[in-house]
A protein has these predicted regions:
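Conserved helix-turn-beta segment of the N-terminal RecA-like "Helicase ATP-binding" lobe
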Residues: 214-226
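N-terminal accessory targeting/assembly segments
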Residues: 1-113, 118-122
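Active-site phosphate-binding and catalytic loops of NTP-dependent enzymes
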Residues: 20-24, 64-67, 102-106, 120-127, ...
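Conserved P-loop NTPase nucleotide-binding/switch module
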Residues: 178-199, 204-205, 209-211, 222-223, ...
Length: 518
């Protein structure tokens, strides 16, 4: 009964606010004028009350209108970015203010949909007119509203989950040269959320439609598209739509995190977003700074990524994890935009072309990569299994260099190198084949106990597949225990040790003992 009265009270309060805003006098419509138009930006005069990010309607010669957004406010003019095609819009045409800032539809109706930066459907589905709308540019949660990042977000990639763990509410930059697998890591992370309940939002900024289509098809084939939203601003869209896309996608993801759910936001990519903003700023005649970027380029990315957070209990306890992607040139991490993004985020996953061309995929340079806050969210089982992994792998990479020159090495060095090669084999995974956390723990425990050192190197991928089948057919109880508790008790450790040893024995070419269910 109390909930009924609470609902009635809220509706009366809403009606009272509407009455307070009602004006029975004559409507006053203030019109502006297009002074200059070109390259999808315009200068407008006669609208002194316009707010930043307000939507404006430009009248066309054909009688309809096109939407633009106010990006620069001067005493005598307004700089606008067109959010639609500017055909038939000419200097002298009338401009009408809307008194509303840019907003997008949010809510459950967006799940499974492909939309543009304004929430208009791109998949041929119905319009989202009944969905609630929220502004694209919202303030980030304050310090008091946040909580510690203490829950893991699994990517399904052993190299990340073991050595660069992510937490829910973290911001982790994926950075590297072109064609090194940056988007592949993000897509694999989205695919791995198919059983986790995490809402995924993928935002493409200035990408080719063919590349975007591949991402959407991959998620629909391998992931859970019914819990994904795709926000697309392709390379041939107006620059205003491309600039707006990450903020719109963040608003859509925030809707779920503010209601106690966990959301994942992938932005592909922020380097292109910075280029678009530089283009708009120069066309709007804003003063350029370093590398011709405007002076507030750091701010536009920080105010976006600061919206990703783990919220406290008072705010519902939800989280928004951000995986922004950035491109480098010739592996240069000291460029203007890369250094900005590295300083804003909570860590970076650095990809190298050399590793990619050598067949190590994901091509993660572990030495240059770091996760600053995710380690606190790592479960006990994974933390114990990967405790010495990074050190052993770094030692192997250092020693491997000497073997390339044909130098003689002692037996201890040979063992370290052979062990390191098996670490690398475990960390190399095919795309769209994420490994659950218990599966990774089992492989790492076998590695730590030296079982894989007795297995031929080329058989390591087969062991991974055999272990997946064993978990499915016989080891479901062990799998559930490790997944739920985050720990490997003595019974689970014994079962994993015995059955992995049997699989290694089988793959080594000997007779196969039968696998006992656990």
């Amino acid at each position: 009964m109390s909930s009924f009265f609470e609902t009635v009270r809220k509706r009366f309060d809403k009606a009272e606010k509407r009455l307070d805003q009602f004006n029975a006098g004559p409507a006053l419509d203030i019109l502006g004028r297009v002074e200059r138009l070109g390259y999808d930006v315009a200068s407008v005069s006669g609208l002194p009350e316009t707010r930043l990010n307000e939507l404006l309607l430009f009248e066309r010669a054909t009688g309809d209108s096109v939407t633009a957004m106010a990006l620069a406010l001067d005493p005598d003019s307004i700089g606008c970015a067109m959010l639609g095609r500017a055909e038939n819009v000419e200097a002298g045409n009338r401009v009408r203010g809307t008194s509303t800032v840019a907003s997008v539809p949010v809510g459950e109706a967006l799940l499974g949909r492909t939309v543009d930066s304004l929430g208009n459907p791109l998949d041929g589905g119905s319009k989202l007119e009944a969905s609630p709308r929220e502004p694209v540019d919202k303030p980030a949660p304050g310090i008091i509203e946040r909580d510690f990042v203490n829950e893991p977000l699994y990517t399904g990639l052993a190299v990340i989950d073991a050595m660069l763990p992510l937490g829910r509410g973290q911001r982790e930059l994926i950075i590297g040269d072109r064609e090194t697998g940056k988007t592949a890591i993000a897509v694999d992370t989205m695919v791995n959320q198919r059983d986790s309940g995490v809402i995924c939002v993928y935002c493409a900024v200035g990408q080719k439609l063919s590349s975007v289509t591949e991402v959407i098809d991959a998620v629909r084939r391998y992931g859970a598209p019914e819990r994904c939203i795709f926000v697309i601003a392709a390379a041939d869209d107006p620059p205003g739509l491309q600039w707006l896309a990450p903020y719109a996608a963040c608003t859509m993801a925030e809707y779920f995190s503010e209601r106690g759910k966990d959301a994942l936001l992938v932005i592909d990519d922020l380097t292109q977003h910075a280029v678009i903003y530089r283009q708009l700023s120069l066309l709007l005649r804003n003063p350029p700074g370093r590398e011709a970027y405007p002076g507030d380029i750091f701010y536009i990315h920080s105010r976006l990524l600061e919206r990703a957070a783990k919220l406290g209990r008072e705010r519902g306890g939800g989280s928004l994890t951000a995986l922004p992607i950035a491109a480098t040139e010739e592996g240069n991490l000291s460029g203007y935009i890369p250094t900005n993004l590295i300083s804003i985020t909570d860590g970076q996953i650095v990809l190298e072309p050399r590793l990619f061309h050598e067949g190590q995929k994901p091509a993660v340079n572990v030495g240059k990569s770091v996760s600053r806050v995710g380690g606190k969210s790592q479960v006990t089982a994974m933390r114990q299994a990967a405790e010495t992994l990074r050190l052993e792998y770094a030692q192997f990479l250092e020693l491997e260099i000497f073997t390339r020159f044909g130098g003689m090495v002692d037996e201890r060095t040979k063992r370290i190198i052979e062990h390191g090669r098996r670490i690398r084999a475990i960390l190399t995974q095919p795309q769209f084949a994420p490994l659950p956390m218990p599966h990774q723990v089992a492989l790492l425990l076998a590695l730590n106990e030296g079982m894989l050192d007795r297995l031929p190197l080329e058989k390591v991928p087969q062991l991974r597949d055999s272990l997946r089948r064993w978990f499915s057919d016989h080891g479901s109880a062990v799998f559930e225990r490790v997944a739920v508790t985050g720990e490997v008790d003595e019974a689970s450790r014994k079962s994993l040790r015995e059955n992995v040893a049997k699989l290694v024995f089988e793959l080594s070419g000997s007779a196969t003992p039968s696998l006992a269910p656990s």
